[in-house]
Amino acid sequence: MHITANSLFRDTIHFLRSKWPIIVTFVLLSSTITVVIDSIITPNARSLLAFYQLDIKKYHSLLDFVRTLTIDQQKLLLYASIAKSFSLLIGSTFLLGNLITFIQMTSYKKNITLSIFNNIPYKTFFKLLQLIFTTTIITQLGFLLYFIPGFTTIILFSLSPIILLIEEKTILNSIYASINITLSNFKIIVPAIIFWLCFKIFIILIISYFKFFSDFLAYFILNLCINFISSILIIYLFRCYMILPKFLKN
């Protein structure tokens, strides 16, 4: 069977149209989880970020701004960064786990009930959380070196959550299998990743440039948009993985 990016995109749009209520619900829940956790554990750090944004012209970079802070303020900012990363990690894991499980159940024509919103075993959720944390750290290290290494790791690791949940492999085996499959199907996977990344950058620029909403609402809308486009990418990658020849998955 010949697989093309256009055919996968059409399948993705068709699935999105037929299952959009549940997909939107997952997006709303994951965005709410991220924003609520962030607002609970990082309420005092926003004043530092707001101060930096107001006087951004005084500083050449965020590092220059950090050097002007007291030790306590630096600790607070570090805590805020870790907490924000944690909230994003939890929200992303919730979205990935539930959406992949839902698509898998739909593909096997299983009955969908309200339990789908809490259908992931805790061990599987924690395992997926570890996988996303590991791949995120490696990707961020890649971006610290240069854009190309970071972007390449995003592509190579893109199928690992799907493989982890469907094949029930270990974290390292899921990453290894994802790398092998993406290298063999670069032309199919890369366009979707580029579209997803460009959309994320576009949304971040739009929301950061236009100050129509409060910081809380703007952050929620940002997460909402990013999670929605991420859902489309997950559907695309899931469909891609399922129709690949079996010998490529081993």
Swiss-Prot record:
UniProt keyword annotation of Membrane present: yes
Predominant subcellular localization, coarse grouping: membrane
Source taxon at top rank: Bacteria
UniProt keywords, alphabetically: Cell membrane, Membrane, Transmembrane, Transmembrane helix
TM ranges: 21-41, 86-106, 125-145, 146-166, 188-208, 216-236
Subcellular location: Cell membrane
InterPro entries (UniProt xref): UPF0259
Membrane topology listed for this record: Multi-pass membrane protein
One GO term describing the cellular component: plasma membrane
Family designation: Belongs to the UPF0259 family.
NCBIfam families (UniProt xref): PRK02868.1 (NF002774)
Protein name: UPF0259 membrane protein bbp_256
